[in-house]
């Protein structure tokens, strides 16, 4: 995962911060009955990831940390990760998937294009959702 962060630094032209939840995926996702997936290449290297956290006392969940290695974007990896997360949500009684998009919009333009292609609609500024 650290390697992926370093590659993100090169692609973004700035050093991304490590979100605390990524430092202990087991405690922050798996032990909470949430989920986190990694996309692995043929050399067993992480090339992408996505996380999902339930919203307490609802049938909704938030997606987090969708990341694809920059040199592997537009090869369907992000779509496969998203489809995997959405399938898990459906199988676990989650009816609505939500995602928070970063700002400024120009910096996160890929997210603002990616999610609508997969049926997500904006319901508040910087937030999108999809009924599963």
Regions found by a protein language model. Name each.
Residues 65-68, 74-87, 91, 113, ...:
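Conserved acetyl-CoA-binding loop-helix of GNAT-fold acetyltransferases
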């Amino acid at each position: 995962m650290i390697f992926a962060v370093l590659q993100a630094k090169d692609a973004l032209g700035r050093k991304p911060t490590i979100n605390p939840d990524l430092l202990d995926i087991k405690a922050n996702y798996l032990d909470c009955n949430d989920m986190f997936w990694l996309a692995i290449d043929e050399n067993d290297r992480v090339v992408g990831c996505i996380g999902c956290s339930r919203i307490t006392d609802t049938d909704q969940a938030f997606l987090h940390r969708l990341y694809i290695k920059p040199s592997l974007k537009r090869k369907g990896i992000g779509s496969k990760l998203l489809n995997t997360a959405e399938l898990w949500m459906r199988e676990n009684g989650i009816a609505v998937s939500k995602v928070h998009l970063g700002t400024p919009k120009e910096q996160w333009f890929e997210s603002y294009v990616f999610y609508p292609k997969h049926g997500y609609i904006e319901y508040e500024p910087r937030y999108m959702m999809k009924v599963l």
